[in-house]
Amino acid sequence: MYDVIISGAGPAGCITAKLLADAGYSVLIAEKMPVPRNKSCSGILIQKSVGILEHTFGKIPHAVYAEPHLNKGLLLHTDTGTTVPFDGLCLNVWRSLLDYWTVMEAADAGAVFFSETSVRGFLEKEDHVTVRLDGKCTSELSARILLGCDGPAGTVRSILRKKPGDYITTFQTYHHGDIDLDPAYFHAYLQLELSDYDAWCSVKDDYVIVGVGVQHALDANRYHKKILSFLAENHHARLSAPEFSERWLLPRIGPENPVDLGDGRIFLAGDAAHMLNPMEEGISTALVSGNAFAEALMRTAAPGENPDISRLRSCYTFSLSSTVEHMYQLWKLLAGISPKFSRLGEL
């Protein structure tokens, strides 16, 4: 029996696995995609994320960097016509390579890693959870805890809550070409005509990346054409046809969708737990939540012991309380800047 089975090999799952494996716990990570896996993400690491990653995994290897590898921060172009700078040095990385590095470090520490294998079902029992895996490594295994780190539409959350998640769809394309924007910034746009949620443009190696977040998936292509036209007209974008595109789902943050850390022996972390900062910054909250879960388990049970679930959940919730409050404060700040997000002032 495993101490913990983790669904998803993103930042939340990998940091949990690394910390617990280092401490002698038996951990399995199941990732439905082959690795390295493509993941739609800005790949911008704020200083908080850099600090947590390097404390847990060691120096971030240059192989995961994109150019310009130093990012100066965010320029937020609001729906009121103002531009609000959020300055702060960040690292610009390829998310696929970052995740591959962290999951390999977790495996080297002793975690069992199954790629191309997904959690298809689970059954909670009195002292453990039976987990059904499907894919490359099909099996039925037992664990004292199941941790869902597989996103707002992931299997763990969907089965636990018995309903579809409430989420934002993201769509971004990668182009060759030129644009009159400072490549050292991540540019975000809140104008209503460009998206009913947000839009963005950034540079990574030889690519200009253009994306939108939308309330309804069917609107993604329509709004994406609008941001492309806007960039051509206002920033002299001269872009090739897209080399490739990516879609993803993110939790819709709001009073109706509070942070949700799971129930019973089923725990949630990262965006599966509705932890996400404005402008789709979710790596830091994923790392913090995975770290908090690992530390909570280490405080409540030794390797091979069954934890007191009530105490474990209490420790996990308390450890995240300041992070959740800070996250909500950031959304309230956005609500004060942008009428589009004004309802989030109720958080």
Give short role names for the model-derived ranges.
Residues 1-10:
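Beta1/beta-strand and adjacent pyrophosphate-binding region of the FAD-binding site
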Residues 218-293, 298-301:
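FAD/FMN-dependent oxidoreductases across multiple families
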Residues 298-347:
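C-terminal helical "tail/cap" subdomain of flavin- and related membrane-associated enzymes
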Residues 9, 105-237, 275:
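Predominantly flavin-linked oxidoreductase catalytic cores and closely associated redox partners
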Residues 46-49, 53-101:
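A conserved beta-strand/loop capping segment in the N-terminal third of enzymes
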Residues 13-14:
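N-terminal Rossmann-fold NAD(P) dinucleotide-binding loop
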